[in-house]
């Protein structure tokens, strides 16, 4: 969806899709091997803010923070085809993790998210769901979507194996 978003002048050119997708998925829009892809959401958010296509609205509204401590990919290379046989890629991922570690990100605790959402969360906003899994920052992502006044999540459901709008409010889903 972001790759098809209009430019500031309201235009969307068909040929821009691949270029926009590359800007969104790769560090500063440059493909330079597997580690240049934005695997961690903390890295993706930093890149998006730096390159002007994301805004972190949670920072302005939530006092709750957590520090990033990433290591999952470099400590589980066997789970990634492009890392399992490439010590060089593992070393690069470890450097990337180290560069992100210690950064502070704002979040909303699940017990502080009302079923009807928050006034500053709008339809189409990107929602990242944090995790307690050691070495990871985010467990799941989706798009904010209000249904009958309740904040829902448009997301790729692993259970339903397709993109769905959550049947219950996001606040309820997280509890």
Mark where each language-model region is.
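C-terminal soluble interaction/assembly domains
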Residues: 125-175
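Short alpha-helix capping/helix-loop boundary micro-motifs
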Residues: 106-117, 131
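Short, well-ordered loop/turn sites that connect or cap secondary structure elements
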Residues: 120-121
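Acidic/His-rich structured neighborhood in mature extracellular/periplasmic domains
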Residues: 1-102, 128, 146, 155-158
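Generic detector of bulky aromatic hydrophobic side chains
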Residues: 44-45, 114, 142
């Amino acid at each position: 969806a972001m790759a098809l978003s209009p430019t500031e002048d309201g235009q969307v050119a068909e040929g821009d899709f691949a270029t926009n997708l590359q800007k969104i998925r790769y560090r500063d829009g440059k493909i330079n091997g597997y580690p240049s892809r934005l695997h961690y959401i903390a890295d993706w958010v930093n890149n998006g803010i730096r390159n002007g296509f994301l805004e972190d609205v949670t920072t302005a509204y939530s006092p709750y923070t957590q520090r990033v401590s990433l290591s999952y990919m470099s400590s589980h290379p066997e789970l990634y085809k492009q890392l399992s046989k490439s010590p060089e890629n593992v070393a690069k991922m470890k450097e990337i993790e180290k560069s992100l570690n210690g950064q502070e990100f704002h979040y909303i605790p699940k017990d502080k998210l009302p079923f009807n959402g928050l006034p500053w969360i709008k339809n189409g906003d990107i929602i990242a769901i944090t995790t307690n899994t050691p070495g990871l920052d985010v467990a799941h992502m989706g798009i904010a979507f209000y249904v009958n006044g309740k904040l829902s999540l448009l997301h790729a459901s692993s259970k339903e194996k397709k993109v769905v709008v959550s049947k219950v409010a996001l606040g309820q889903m997280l509890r």
